Amino acid sequence: TCEIYTDVPGVLTTDPRIVPNAKLLDEISCEEMLELSSVGASVLHPRAVEIARNYGIKLCVKSSQSDSSGTLLESQIQPLPLKRGSLELTKTVNSLEVLENQAVFSLSNIPDRPGIAAQIFEKLSEASINVDLIIQATNDGNNNDITFTVSELEVKKTAEQCELLTIQLGGEYNLKTNMTKLSIQGAGIMGRPSVSADLFDTLSQANINVRLIATSEIKVSCVIEINNIPKAIRFIAEKFKLSDTQIFVNPINEKQDQPEVRGIALDKNQVQVSFRKLPDRPGVAASICLALAENNLLFDTIVQSERISSSKTKDISLTMNKQDREKANLVFEDLTKKLPGSYIEDGPAIAKVSTVGAGMAFKVGTAGKIFRALADQNINIEMIATSEIRTSCIVLEKDCDKAVNA
């Protein structure tokens, strides 16, 4: 075990400067810690956690000022063999996961006010529907869109609940079946924007249109039509040099006994940018990510959701570091020239609140609880992006401390 001594007793559930009664965690997985450390939990540098995760090194974070037992970090993946020389990996992507038989539900033109997301996912939870991806891009006017995925086995009862929700809230819903979720995984993916760019560019070269996009620190997920799966797997495996043992189709996750929420992190160093009225065709997401990567501009959360519309366009929203926004102006101007009819829209001052827990994928209703906690504080959600172990909500900067305390 590698012991690391700091000025805090270990890893806490959240920032004690915001929540004075934050609790010390006895243990946390490296995967959970990567998600937390990437969004503001500064106890450990993400690169230290990444090396521990890759090589199965146990870390224990302790205080240099007390005898507390601290927090133990352990990796949940098969460790790589240690070799002489650098511990840095030349391959950022270490696996591809394929989840088949997914259905995409899109609720469009619903009200944009606090409590709507809570109402939707509480309703789904009451019907015992387990939701996977949840995506909300930035709102357009006074209404909003929320898109989510479920197993095709739950389509009938999900459609019934969506029908009731549109009666209560207004708007409409759309259903797409025969969809599949693809996810590339690797520590620190979002710190390397070229990785997302390579994924979307690879799918574009295969003439595969991406329907949904959601990201976290260690995973980039997208939803495509099921008939494109064999081609997508072949192209992605070739691009990222993945062997058959690194490709998992419908994997069985063994983390079901883990807590649904382990910790909460806050990142105030983000700005929100939306690309409006983009053409709905292969290669658009790739062109955005490639342009940012080529200019060394880091983006964080990036989401693309579905909207019911007669025009064949889509919106993509992302967050990026505040200091990079001005540098991105020329890049964005060039992009919109190449994508006729599109335009850039800057959002208000925002912050990102991320809830992390390895067990949240198996607990029906976790998302509803998170969104209800924000609604009870009258906090509106600007964007939502999820992975299996992280739910990130973009809120107004003025509400961020209140959101963490919620």
Model-predicted regions and their roles:
Residues T1-T386, R390-A406:
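C-terminal catalytic "cap/lid" subdomain
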